[in-house]
């Protein structure tokens, strides 16, 4: 029976500052580092082990994975990084404080941008502070100017089918360290959560989510490791 573990990165600097982060690269806070270490220690204590690891191109997810693996004595495990596991791109909201954005645009509009399934935020204007077009890690990639959750799912699921699902079907134990919305995409797919419900699903930082899967990758169980 294949085992899959999902971990949202530990608290980041912009989580702490309540800013829209998206594709912008920010580091973990001390609390985020502690969350990642605790996740690794918990997985080791519960007897979890892995054969293959996946993460995004973003530092906060990569570091969370590395810190957790170090706590498990598994830094040597193979890791594949891919931009398709990145956080949802928040477009022109990137870098803005969420409370200030609500004061400027109104709570209702900000809720639409944050929590609707298929309505993206305003686009990120090219050439600005948060333009990633010259970031070498994204060379050859068509960087989005904004994304809805639906857009995020549209890039995450092909990667799942192409790379991750075959590993699980081959019997490999897999851990994915990623982001709130890229993980929502996977949870929606695996647990068949409707469009209007997935936007309300909260995924806390640094908490391993365990999926016990049938051989055809249908979900038999989903739970937070800390609760079992």
Curated annotation (Swiss-Prot):
Keyword Ribosomal protein: no
Biological processes, Gene Ontology terms: gluconeogenesis; glycolytic process
Pathway linked to the protein: Carbohydrate degradation; glycolysis; pyruvate from D-glyceraldehyde 3-phosphate: step 3/5
Binding site for substrate: 8-15, 21-22, 60, 87-90, 98, 114-115, 180-181
InterPro entries to which the protein is assigned, alphabetical: His_Pase_superF_clade-1, His_PPase_superfam, PG/BPGM_mutase_AS, Phosphogly_mut1
Subunit and partners: Homodimer.
Protein name as catalogued: 2,3-bisphosphoglycerate-dependent phosphoglycerate mutase
Naturally occurring in which organism (per UniProt): Rhizorhabdus wittichii (strain DSM 6014 / CCUG 31198 / JCM 15750 / NBRC 105917 / EY 4224 / RW1)
UniProt lineage: Bacteria, Pseudomonadati, Pseudomonadota, Alphaproteobacteria, Sphingomonadales
């Amino acid at each position: 029976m294949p085992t899959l573990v999902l971990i949202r990165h530990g608290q980041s600097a912009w989580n702490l500052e309540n800013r829209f982060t998206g594709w912008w690269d920010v580091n973990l806070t001390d609390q985020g580092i502690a969350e990642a270490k605790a996740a690794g220690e918990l997985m080791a204590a519960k007897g979890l082990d892995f054969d293959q690891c996946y993460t995004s191109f973003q530092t906060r997810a990569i570091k969370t994975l590395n810190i957790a693996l170090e706590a498990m004595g598994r830094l040597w495990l193979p890791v594949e990084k891919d931009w398709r596991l990145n956080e949802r791109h928040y477009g022109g909201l990137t870098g803005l404080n969420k409370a200030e954005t609500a004061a400027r645009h109104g709570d209702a509009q900000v809720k639409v941008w944050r929590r609707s399934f298929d309505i993206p935020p305003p686009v990120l204007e090219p050439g600005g502070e948060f333009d990633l077009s010259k970031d070498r890690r994204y060379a050859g990639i068509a960087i989005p100017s904004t994304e809805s959750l639906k857009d995020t799912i549209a890039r995450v699921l092909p990667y799942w089918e192409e790379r991750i699902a075959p590993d699980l079907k081959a019997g490999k134990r897999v851990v994915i360290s990623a982001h709130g919305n890229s993980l929502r995409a996977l949870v929606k797919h695996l647990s068949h959560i409707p469009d209007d419900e997935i936007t309300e699903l909260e995924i806390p930082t640094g908490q391993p989510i365990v999926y016990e899967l049938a051989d055809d990758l249908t979900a038999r169980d989903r739970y937070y490791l800390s609760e079992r």
